Design a protein with these regions (language model features):
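Phosphate- and other anionic-substrate recognition elements at nucleic-acid/protein interfaces
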Residues: 1-200
Length: 200
């Protein structure tokens, strides 16, 4: 039995979304990446002097929300594994944090919340893993995924923006190891088996 889940690495500028298919009939819960999307937004430069900052933030929030909902609806996901952003000391960073929390609150499927440390540990086993280490680990574990690439010195190499997709990927890996997910997956598996047993 397989289900779809989405990993989310949220930020106002780069919102990483990764959809995976998880085999919940296997106690190890192996998963394969089926789709990924990096939704990027920037402050409006053309209208900087004519549009209020909060109006521009609303525009950007809608873009991110629509991207999240598109992936959830397109793949009919069952769970969301989310690296919850932490607060910051600057007012602007806190504003971005609040926007991301608001977008996540609109997620229509059950959400398993994860810390940045949990995600890094799931990816590399190191709490202080660098973005390059996370990207390399994600690419090595999931070569089937459509990672963002560009040409450098005549060779195709991974883009640094894969950082957000790598974090979303390892949010899934961290999430499937939580008691919360394993309990829910077990209930779903038992319900599936019971339903099919009745038909035999």
């Amino acid at each position: 039995m397989k289900i779809k889940a989405i990993g989310i690495d949220p930020s106002l500028r780069n919102f990483g979304l990764v959809v995976a298919e998880i085999d919940i009939s296997n106690d190890d819960y192996p998963f394969e990446i089926k789709d990924m999307m990096l939704v990027q937004t920037e402050s409006s430069k053309e209208t900087k002097k004519t549009v209020r900052k909060n109006s521009d933030d609303l525009r950007r929030a809608k873009i991110l929300h629509d991207g999240m909902m598109h992936m959830i609806n397109k793949h009919k996901v069952t769970f969301a594994f989310v690296e919850i952003p932490t607060g910051s000391q600057t007012a602007r960073a806190m504003s971005s944090y609040g926007i991301c929390i608001g977008i996540l609150s609109a997620c229509p499927v059950p959400m398993i919340q994860l810390t940045p440390f949990e995600v890094k540990l799931a990816g590399t086993g190191i709490k202080s893993a660098t973005k390059h280490e996370m990207i390399e680990a994600a690419f090595t574990e999931h070569p089937e995924a459509k990672w963002l690439m560009h040409k450098r010195n005549g060779e195709m190499v991974l883009k640094e923006s894969n950082e957000h997709l790598a974090d979303a990927t390892f949010a899934i890996k961290a999430g499937i190891n939580t008691d919360e997910f394993r309990f829910s997956a077990g209930m779903m598996r038992n319900a599936f088996l019971a339903t099919h047993a009745e038909k035999i």
